[in-house]
Amino acid sequence: GSKAHNTAANPLTGGIQVTVCYNRDHIKAVEISNTRPFAVTRLFREKPVDRVLAMMPSLFYICGMGQLIAALRAVESAAGITETSAIKQARDTLLFAESLREQVFSWVTNWAPQHKSRMSHVVDWFNQCRKQLDWSLTLASATTGEAGCRPALEQLARQLEDVVKPLLPASREGASLATMGVSAGVCQLLKACGEYPLGLAAKTLNLSESQQLMATLAALNAAEAEQFCHQPTISGVPAETGSWARQNIEARGFLIESRLRSLYREITTAPMRLRSTIRQQQFSQTEGTGVRGCSVVETARGTLLHKVALDNRNQVAKYQIIAPTEWNFHPQGSLK
């Protein structure tokens, strides 16, 4: 047999190394090594919440907006601060905008490189969202800027239509990969992969389901909590999160093409989904997780959880993060 592996690891930030053991055209085993610095939250202990929040953007380059909003919501929950409906709407839009930017980047980098030049329009739109809504990125008790929220959101939703349309030549369900803009080389590769159905994926992560959330929180309170954040499971069973999991709560992914289509579907439906969120007659009051100091948000790569405990000086006593990558690259997870 032979082995092949990626070289994603960085000496400073770590990474995920996937080693594939194969014999001719059959994969015999997949080994996953995660060297990401999962104990980074130790830096937050005994620091004031304002300082911790200020550290978020520099510590987390990928999905930095998601990390910051998850942190804000966790701290607000721990401090008993209520997130108003307008702040929730603005933050949800920023989460949505960052997720879309990351998904489009993945699409044009990996599947449709001929559209790479159009990525700039999505980046510009995200920056516009940030400019219009950054008033919501402070603790809710200190926020002033809600008055013009609704018109700004309406305008951003209209702009998104023009941004997404040129990127996606086919929005029809079941369109061929070539019609969707997938490059010829990738189409051939996916056709070849289609002859070898994949095994069952890991179970679907759904932390809005109280049973899964409670099992996760119980593990975060156990002695091995730090290791759990590195290799999380639901009661010992690996789970998958991301665009495939969001759309296929009961189904399982047998073909790589199915997963590619789930990413494409989320991008094509983005304008419609943003519009329906914004045009709800009444902003719903934030539901949260119902657990003090805990927040769960959706990012491009999947579900992100922050859990914080504050001491009586309003400093961080304990901080825990479980990122989507740790679910999706569990040594016994879907990739295995």
Map each language-model feature to its residues.
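A short beta-strand signature within small-molecule sensing/ligand-binding domains used
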Residues: 304-306
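Acidic, carboxylate-rich catalytic segments that either coordinate divalent cations
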Residues: 319-320
